[in-house]
């Protein structure tokens, strides 16, 4: 809501009378549009414009950029569908597209175009239809490719509106149809120029029906009389003219010019590409003037005798002078005004209506407008001057006003100064003879001595060389003679041709009824005295020798009547008859005209004045008399071409201006603002609305004319640039020709020097030949010497190769010897390692033998104690036996598993040995391959092998050193543990001996106490022992890391699996609880002895066979063997004694670890 309120405040400030505030608000709107991409702001501006017709809002909307173009087109499309806002929104659309925004190509795909076409098909409001048609005509050159989708819609609109021009509905005012007819005429030109094949096909099919035949005869056929045959009708086809590739090379102004080229109507036609109007045409038509006291040569600029087209119009020349004063640019005899040939200039309605305040314009106004225009063309002060460049090569004028401004400067009525002498009019050049005459208060004419003329002569550089001075003087005399002959002729006014009726006939004839002539004559009689009418000579001027050849059929002007204006005709009447032929923006005093009928001289007429100058003079006089007779006698018999709808519109505007000025003249001067209606009082509302609609239609038509003029100016600027480039290229070519001449001179000089050099070269060649023969003989001698030296070098080379081969063989033998030495060193190190392992095994074996002796003594001691026990312990013994049996079964299963593991380990050993053999074989092959490679690599491989052997020896020494250190650490730890266990066992034995002296009752009590105590003692170190065993196994990874590096076998605890770990746990606990001070060595025939030997032998053999086993692995095997032997020593202890003695408390305390429940708990 705050944003909407802010936008409302900005809109209120948009039409502020303060220019600074208005500019700031406009800048804020543009910034918001750049930052906000939503449609809200655009919709608000469109609504505001429709409500207020604000010009700042219109300026913002016409300068919108992407992506707001879609929002604008959508909003316009929305309002086009509403009848109340259709007219104003179409006017907004016209303003937008006339500026040709960068997104104009999107119009063909926007939904607005179908809506516009639908509106033109369905709407019945003439103002809306006329505005829409002008918008469509303006839009078509921008989106020519849209014809492929909407071509039939364009044709339907033309058919509908052309029928309206004839069969008008009852609710439509007749005056509106003039504007509609002019719009339909422009649409006809656009469709015929862009799509001729399809359009002619439509006309053929549509107007072949009987109901449309009258429309064709009255409306369409007169339009077709004003166009040429389009070249596409001969060379093109329907599909070709709709092909998008046809339009890719054309811009908007190119399309407009292409459409104008095929028009014969001077208001629509273009005179480019070598086309020039024939000099005879202007003799058939009247020329307009602005005052009755004119000189007979005041309107020579209206002749069609000029051939080339300048890129700008005199209507854009602004003369800065005050009323009542004659500007220096007009009075100076050395001044030449920039002008345009009449075929490129149009009569402006603002000249007739008296509009002195045209709309403002954007564009840059040149700072200096009062300088003489002769400076632009480089003319001199006297008579005829040669400009520096043709109008085609002169720079384009800066836009003095807005493109729709029709500059009008009212000159005060003062005394006329007739021309000082007859100036030659060369119809092949764009010349302008202007005499600006000032009328005095009485309207009298000054004496002829004060005549002055201003001449603009174009440079004929692109047309040919100038005629000689004598020919020019002779032609001036002939021209003066013709002018004097014509000045003696007085003509009477011919009877006018009465038209069919009012505006119901769109193409009525050129002349007006006699009553209208009389009315205009009476109305103009109060403005000044009349002068004797003098005919114009410019239309019969001779064509120069450099007249360009006509490229097209000349344009037949639409008002070629034989009527004459009476001597007292006022300005508006003369302008009414020749409305489209006055190029000047100023009101110039008009001459009375002489019509020469519709007859034309033959096209070869101008050749006579070149070949036979004197004969041509008499021929022109005779031809003039014949034309005058024909004009007097056969005025009504001549067929007058139909009037263009544009001229009809111009005449309507002129008649409105006449009526307005007539009513104002009836009123006294102080009351010019009084209501001008015929009956007095306020005009009716319908008349006000009609006038407002007419004003709107006229404004739309002027905007369309502005658009056309913009396109022509753009085209002219392009052509001007091309002409400037052509002139520059010609100058460049001339400079290149001069350079070519200089270079040819240089070439001649170089040729002479070349001959001298060739002679010198021949001498040098002879000298060179003699020198070459001498050098050849020397070369042959040197080649012979070189061959001898080459043979000697070959012999030395062969000797060198033999020496190199011997050295290579000796190096190979040396490498083999080194390999053998390294191999023997490796074998020696392995043997030394095995020897050290065997020594450590022997030491372990001695230690185990000692342990076995100790355990045997302990066993005998236990047997004696059991024999000495009472017989009351039978139940306990039975339970223990049962437990021992179960434990024996478990141990047997463990033994079986151990044997299975042993078998698998043996198989694994065999597999590893086979792998080792394969590896040895591969190593041998690789050694052979390496030897071959060494032969090729030579020095580099030898150095690499030496480094490799040295590194290998170092790593072997380091590994042996590391393994030795790990073995020492493990031995030291094991010895310390054994010493601690021996000390504990000795203390326990002494305690048990003390307890044996007590009684039976005391022994039972002590037995229970010690059992509980030993349970606590054995349970407490159990976690530590478990931690120690697991730590030795887990941390044994660190101690046995070297063995893992040297052999691929897994550690013993990883190979054994869960059974081995459980076995080691139980054995570790059992060995920890068994005293080591008592017992004897088991016999070799007992189960324990055999099992111990088998295990020891297997372990030792596998340890000796595995080359990669280290000392840490041997130590781990020793500890496991000790544990196994400790457990197996207990098993036959219980089995060999079939008559156990009653256990002592010490024995009970020592055997509690074998309890079934406890062992079962530990295994679980």
Curated annotation (Swiss-Prot):
Changing residue 305 to W: In TSC1; uncertain significance; no effect on expression; no effect on inhibition of TORC1 signaling. The modification Phosphoserine is found at residues 487, 505, 511, 521, 598, 1100. Signal peptide: none annotated. The keyword Ion transport does not apply. The keyword Membrane applies. One of its GO terms (molecular function) is ATPase inhibitor activity. One of its GO terms (biological process) is D-glucose import. It is found in: Lysosome membrane; Cytoplasm, Cytosol. Changing residue 941 to A: Abolished interaction with TBC1D7. Changing residue 762 to S: In TSC1; uncertain significance; no effect on expression; no effect on subcellular localization; no effect on inhibition of TORC1 signaling. There is a cross-link at residue 30 (Glycyl lysine isopeptide (Lys-Gly) (interchain with G-Cter in ubiquitin)). Residues 513-530, 1073-1085 have a biased composition (Polar residues). The C-terminal putative coiled-coil domain is necessary for interaction with TSC2. This is Hamartin. It comes from Homo sapiens.
């Amino acid at each position: 809501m705050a944003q909407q309120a802010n936008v409302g405040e900005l809109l209120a400030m948009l039409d502020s009378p303060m220019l600074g505030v208005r500019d700031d608000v406009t800048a804020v709107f543009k910034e918001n549009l750049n930052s906000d991409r939503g449609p809200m702001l655009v919709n608000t501006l469109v609504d505001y414009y429709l409500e207020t017709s604000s010009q700042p809002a219109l300026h913002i909307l016409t300068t919108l950029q992407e992506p707001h173009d879609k929002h604008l087109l959508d909003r316009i499309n929305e309002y086009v569908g509403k009848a109340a806002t259709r007219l104003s929104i179409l006017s907004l659309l016209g303003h937008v597209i006339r500026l040709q925004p960068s997104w104009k190509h999107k119009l063909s795909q926007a939904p607005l175009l179908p809506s516009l076409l639908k509106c033109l098909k369905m709407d019945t409001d003439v103002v809306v239809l006329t505005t829409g048609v002008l918008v469509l005509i303006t839009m078509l050159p921008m989106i020519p490719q849209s014809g492929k989708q909407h071509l039939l819609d364009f044709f339907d609109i033309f058919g509908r509106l052309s029928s309206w021009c004839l069969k008008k509905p009852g609710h439509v005012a007749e005056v509106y149809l003039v504007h509609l007819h002019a719009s339909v005429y422009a649409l006809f030109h656009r469709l015929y120029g862009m799509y001729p094949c399809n359009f002619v096909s439509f006309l053929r099919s549509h107007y072949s029906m009987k109901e449309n035949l009258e429309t064709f005869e009255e409306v369409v056929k007169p339009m077709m009389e004003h166009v040429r045959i389009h070249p596409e009708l001969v060379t093109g086809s329907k599909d070709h003219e709709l092909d998008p590739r046809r339009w890719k090379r054309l811009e908007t102004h190119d399309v407009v010019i292409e459409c104008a080229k095929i028009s014969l109507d001077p208001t629509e036609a273009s005179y480019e590409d070598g086309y020039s109007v024939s000099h005879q045409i202007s003799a058939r038509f009247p020329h307009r003037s602005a005052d009755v006291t004119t000189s007979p040569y005041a309107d020579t600029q209206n002749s069609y005798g000029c051939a080339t087209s300048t890129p700008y119009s005199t209507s854009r020349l602004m003369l800065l002078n005050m009323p009542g004063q004659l500007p220096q640019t007009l009075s100076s005899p050395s001044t030449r005004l920039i002008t345009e040939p009449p075929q490129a200039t149009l009569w402006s309605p603002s000249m007739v209506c008296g509009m002195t305040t045209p709309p403002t314009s954007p564009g840059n106004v040149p700072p200096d407008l009062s300088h003489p225009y002769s400076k632009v063309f480089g003319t001199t002060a006297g008579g005829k001057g040669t400009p520096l460049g043709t109008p085609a090569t002169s720079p384009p004028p800066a836009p003095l006003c807005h493109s729709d401004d029709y500059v009008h400067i009212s000159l005060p009525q003062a005394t006329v100064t007739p021309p000082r002498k007859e100036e030659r009019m060369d119809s092949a050049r764009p010349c302008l003879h202007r005499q600006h005459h000032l009328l005095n208060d009485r309207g009298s004419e000054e004496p002829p001595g004060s005549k002055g003329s201003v001449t603009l002569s174009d440079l004929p550089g692109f047309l040919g060389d100038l005629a000689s001075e004598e020919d020019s003087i002779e032609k001036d005399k002939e021209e003066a003679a013709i002018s004097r002959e014509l000045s003696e002729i007085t003509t009477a006014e011919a009877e006018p041709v009465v038209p069919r009726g009012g505006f119901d006939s769109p193409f009525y004839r050129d002349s007006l009824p006699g009553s209208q002539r009389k009315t205009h004559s009476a109305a103009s009689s109060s403005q000044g005295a009349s002068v004797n009418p003098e005919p114009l000579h410019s239309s019969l001027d001779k064509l120069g020798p450099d007249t360009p050849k006509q490229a097209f059929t000349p344009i037949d002007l639409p008002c070629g009547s034989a009527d004459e204006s009476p001597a007292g005709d006022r300005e508006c009447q003369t302008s009414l008859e020749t409305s489209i032929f006055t190029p000047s923006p100023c009101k110039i005093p008009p001459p009375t005209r002489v019509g020469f009928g519709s007859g034309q001289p033959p096209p070869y007429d101008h050749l006579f004045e070149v070949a036979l100058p004197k004969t041509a003079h008499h021929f022109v006089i005779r031809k003039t008399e014949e034309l005058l007779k024909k004009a007097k006698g056969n005025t009504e018999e001549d067929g007058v071409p139909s009037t263009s709808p544009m001229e009809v519109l111009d005449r309507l505007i002129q008649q409105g201006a006449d009526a307005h000025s007539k009513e104002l003249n009836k009123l006294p001067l102080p009351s010019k603002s009084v209501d001008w209606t015929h009956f007095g009082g306020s005009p009716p509302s319908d008349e006000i609305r009609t006038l407002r609609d007419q004003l709107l239609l006229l404004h739309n038509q002027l905007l369309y004319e502005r658009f056309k003029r913009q396109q022509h100016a753009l085209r002219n600027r392009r052509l001007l640039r091309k002409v400037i480039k052509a002139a520059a290229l010609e100058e460049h070519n001339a400079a290149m020709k001069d350079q070519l001449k200089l270079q040819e001179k240089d070439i001649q000089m170089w040729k002479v020097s070349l001959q001298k050099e060739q002679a010198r070269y021949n001498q040098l060649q002879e000298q060179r030949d003699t020198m070459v023969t001498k050098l050849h003989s020397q070369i042959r001698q040197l080649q012979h010497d070189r061959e001898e030296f080459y043979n000697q070098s070959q012999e030395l080379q062969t000797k060198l190769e033999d020496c190199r081969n011997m050295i290579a063989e000796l190096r190979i033998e040396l490498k083999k010897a080194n390999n053998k030495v390294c191999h023997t060193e490796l074998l020696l190190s392995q043997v030394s390692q095995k020897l050290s392992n065997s020594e450590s095994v022997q030491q372990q074996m001695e230690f185990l033998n000692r342990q076995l002796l100790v355990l045997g003594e302990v066993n005998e001691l236990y047997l004696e104690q059991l024999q000495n026990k009472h017989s009351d312990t039978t139940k306990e013994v039975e339970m223990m036996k049962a437990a021992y049996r179960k434990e024996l079964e478990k141990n047997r299963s463990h033994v079986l598993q151990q044997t299975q593991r042993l078998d698998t380990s043996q198989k694994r050993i065999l597999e590893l040995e086979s792998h080792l053999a394969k590896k040895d074989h591969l190593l041998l092959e690789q050694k052979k391959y390496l030897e071959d490679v060494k032969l090729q690599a030579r020095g580099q491989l030898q150095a690499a092998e030496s480094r490799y052997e040295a590194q290998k020896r170092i790593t072997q020494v380091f590994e042996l050193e590391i393994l030795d250190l790990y073995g020492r650490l493990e031995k030291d730890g094991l010895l310390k543990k054994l010493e601690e266990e021996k000390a504990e066992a000795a203390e326990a034995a002494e305690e048990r001996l003390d307890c044996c002296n007590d009684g039976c009752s005391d022994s039972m009590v002590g037995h229970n106490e010690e059992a509980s105590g030993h349970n606590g003692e054995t349970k407490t170190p159990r976690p530590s022992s478990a931690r120690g065993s697991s730590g030795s196994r887990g941390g044994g990874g660190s101690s046995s890391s070297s063995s893992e590096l040297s052999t691929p076998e897994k550690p013993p605890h990883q190979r054994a699996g869960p059974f081995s770990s459980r076995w080691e746990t139980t054995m570790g606990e059992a060995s920890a609880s068994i005293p080591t001070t008592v017992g004897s060595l088991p016999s070799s025939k007992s189960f324990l002895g055999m099992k111990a030997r088998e295990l020891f032998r297997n372990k030792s053999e596998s340890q000796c066979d595995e080359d990669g086993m280290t000392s840490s692995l041997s130590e781990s095997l020793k500890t496991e063997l000790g544990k196994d032997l400790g457990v197996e020593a207990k098993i036959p202890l219980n089995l060999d004694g079939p008559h156990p003695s009653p256990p002592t408390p010490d024995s009970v305390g020592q055997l509690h670890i074998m309890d079934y429940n406890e062992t079962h708990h530990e295994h679980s």
